[in-house]
Every structure is written in structure tokens, then in C-alpha cells.
Amino acid sequence: MIDDFRFGRITVIGDLLLDQYISGGVSRISPEAPVPVVLHDGLRCVPGGAANVAVNAAALGAQVHLVGLVGEDDSAARLKETLKLWPTIETDGIVSSPDWTTITKTRVVSGRQQIVRIDVEKLTPLSETLQQRLVEEACRAIAVSDVLVCSDYAKGVLTDEVLRAIIAAGREKGIPVIVDPKRHTFEAYAGATLVTPNRIEAQQASGLPARTDGEVLKVAETLSGQFGGNVLVTRSEDGMTLWQHDAKPLHVASRKSEVFDVSGAGDTVVATVAAVLSAGQTLETAVVIATAAAALSVSKFGTATVSREELSRELLQEMPETGALVPVEQAARIVESWHRHGAKVVFTNGCFDLVHPGHVSLLQAAAREGDRLVVALNTDRSVSRLKGPTRPVQKEEARARVIGALRSVDLVVLFDEDTPLEVIRTLKPDILVKGADYTEDQVVGADVVKSYGGKVVLVDLVEGQSTTRLVRGMQSAPS
């Protein structure tokens, strides 16, 4: 999926942090106090805050212009050194000031257990001169960017004045403006395209509970009223919910993963959404891909990035092999993904007991009508009800395997009812194909497909080909 994306340029502005990890082994308790003694064996420094958003976007292949504020101190030097590892990140927009202390979070860890975190931050109000320099650097970057990200850690860089100026610049350029928020309310983000609070941030800013899907949608609508844009609520194990003014809500289930550390997961989400939008994809597609990126991020320890290769492999896990037999629920998610990428989905159904040239011809003709072909097979019980107790000749697993092996078939599902009506309603195919021995008014699901703009296609059959005829021939053949 993402292998074909051509990522664009992203401006990231916000609070720059340095994340440090002091690691070591613990084998005893201090005699001085009831605390573990850590035998130091390493120090790792990684970009944090807005800088982590930048490296996550760069890891996917985007060009990034990073704008922010650091002090003239050792932490600033370490942060800039870590950013040199990412040649696609432009750091000329980082402003240095002797009046600012580079925000540093130092974690002491043993194994994958965090023992203590030590923060260094002395937050002072920004002078008008510093604010103006930040705006100038941001506007210079926005002029050549495809997406603007404001990473607000509430550390003082994104003042009301800075936000107003850069959001206005993004809107004037006509590019998406994404805000990762930390404020108690979202009025300061007026004009943003998308704000991405987590569940706790959304509850605090709205004053409403956000436990169920319905509650989250109400929260998102309330938050949108504060700034006027769309809202993406990240919900940990409950996935993500996208609320938009001009589209239906989108709930994306979380992907199963072993959670080691949630540090920086929100940065990964906003970076992925920004990168996918910079490639010209839809917001819905960006959210689905960001859900996969988040699952990878929390499976890593500490502030981490997700590479394009890792994300591509993760996304492919959701997509089965061509012709695979999958549950209808999974098929619905796959078809939805195909639709988001502009594919026309074709649907046909049948018992397909003993596959013969007539079946192959029908499926080849069906596949030519669109981009993806889903075949729904009657289960064994369904076939017996329709054809009699001696059928099917082949069990459903065997029939599914044979049909799925045909080059023209992309996906196979089973249905236990006498007709595939419910499957059609669930999958919402664009084109419904049956043999020309039917008339359109006889095709089950024709009215459903046509109700949302789809069509029904009747294809010519190969004369003299019939499973029933084959079965009779086998029964009458001399033993």
C-alpha cells in the first residue's frame, strides 16, 4: 500500500524535547535508602516532542522542515546531534536562545522497566522577538510544504500569537494544518484542519465522558465547535475515531500488539497522518495507516520511530493472500480499504461444487468488470438445502481453496443462508455479477447494489456446462 506513496514536504513546529535513557542493571538495594542501585552501562539520546514527530515523518520518507526553540546548552547540542542522523530533516528553523532551557526528560531504566524520570525545564514567557523569529522560520518552511503540523506540548513555544500566525499561513497556502494538542480547551487552534487529542485530552477539553463510540463522537463534535475543524480521537486499545464535518464518522479498531511503552505514540500518529496526507491520500486512509503505525510504536521501548518497511509489513498482515478465505467481517474491512483506494469491487456467488469451464468463464468475465473480485460460496449446509442431501460433492473448505486458487479471484467468503443478501449488504460491492440465465429482477441483492449507485451485470454462460450434469454423469458411469 504505502510502497507506492510519494511523500511530500512537511513543516513541523512546536516544543522540542530531548529524551535521554540511562540504562543499567539492578542487583541490589541501596544501603542508604530503600531504592535500587543501577549500575550504569549506557546513555541513549533521542529527539522528543515536536522533534519526535519530525523523525517519525522522516522515517516514512517525508521531507521535513523542523521549527522550534532550544537553549544554548549541552542538551541542545545533543538534540541537534541526534537530528543529524536524519538527513531529510531540515533544522535551519531551530531557533537558539540563551534565555531558554532545552527541555530534557531523562529516564533511568533497567531492562524495560522505567525506575524514575527526571525532567529539566524552566519555562519562561517568550519575548515578542523570539515569537516573531519562530513565525518567520515557520512561514518560510510553510511556503514550500504540503502539510503543517503544530506539536503542542504546552511548554510555551506555541503561544496564541504564534498559533494564529502559522495556522493563517497554512490556510493561505491551502495545505492541511494538523494540531497535536495539550491545552485545556481548543479555541487557540481555530482554523486548523484536524486536531488529534487522546481520550484523556478529549475528555478534559470537552468536559464530557469518552468511553463508548457514541460518547466519543459527542466529545469530538463538541471539540470541533471550539476550533471549527475535524477531530481524531486516539483511544489506545479502542482504536481511533475520526469525526468530520462533511463525512460519516470513522471508527478504526486497534491492531493487536504487545504494549511495552506508550511514550511518543501520539507523535507517531500525527506524523503518519501528516505523511500520508502529504502523499495526496485521503484523511480516512491516513487514519487507517496511522492506526497500524501506532501499534508498532507501542510495541517498542521508549521514544521510537516506525520505518516505512515496518509499516508496509504491518499493513500487509491485514491483507490476506490473493484468493484467501476470510470471515465476512474481515472481508468488509478489506473491501472498505479497497474502496478508499478507488478500487471497483465485483461480487458474485454460487455453490461452485465441481468447478468446470463454465465456472471459470463466469469468474473471468466477472473479474473484468472491476478491480477486485469477491466470491461468496454457499456453506455445505446451504448447498444441501438447495441441492439435496447428496450435495455438495466437495466440502466447503475444498471448494473455497479451488475457487481461491483461480487468478481472477481476490477474496472468498462463506454464507450459511439460502441467499447472499446479507453478505451483499455487509460488503457493499460496486458490481453484482450473475449468469445470463437470470434476469436482473431475479438477481438477489440487485436492488441493494443499485440503491447506492452500483450496477448488475449478466454474463453469458458456456453451453453444456453444469455441476448437476457432471454429478449425474459420474453416477451413471460404469464402475
Curated annotation (Swiss-Prot):
Region of interest called Ribokinase, as start-end residue ranges on this chain: 1-322
| Keyword Kinase applies | yes
Pathway where this protein functions: Nucleotide-sugar biosynthesis; ADP-L-glycero-beta-D-manno-heptose biosynthesis; ADP-L-glycero-beta-D-manno-heptose from D-glycero-beta-D-manno-heptose 7-phosphate: step 1/4; Nucleotide-sugar biosynthesis; ADP-L-glycero-beta-D-manno-heptose biosynthesis; ADP-L-glycero-beta-D-manno-heptose from D-glycero-beta-D-manno-heptose 7-phosphate: step 3/4
Classification via SUPFAM superfamilies? Nucleotidylyl transferase, Ribokinase-like
- What's its catalytic activity? D-glycero-beta-D-manno-heptose 7-phosphate + ATP = D-glycero-beta-D-manno-heptose 1,7-bisphosphate + ADP + H(+); D-glycero-beta-D-manno-heptose 1-phosphate + ATP + H(+) = ADP-D-glycero-beta-D-manno-heptose + diphosphate
Residues of the active site are D267
List GO terms (cellular component aspect). Answer: cytosol
Q: How does it assemble?
A: Homodimer.
> Member of which family?
In the N-terminal section; belongs to the carbohydrate kinase PfkB family.
Give the function comment from the record. Answer: Catalyzes the ADP transfer from ATP to D-glycero-beta-D-manno-heptose 1-phosphate, yielding ADP-D-glycero-beta-D-manno-heptose.
Q: What is this protein called?
A: Bifunctional protein HldE
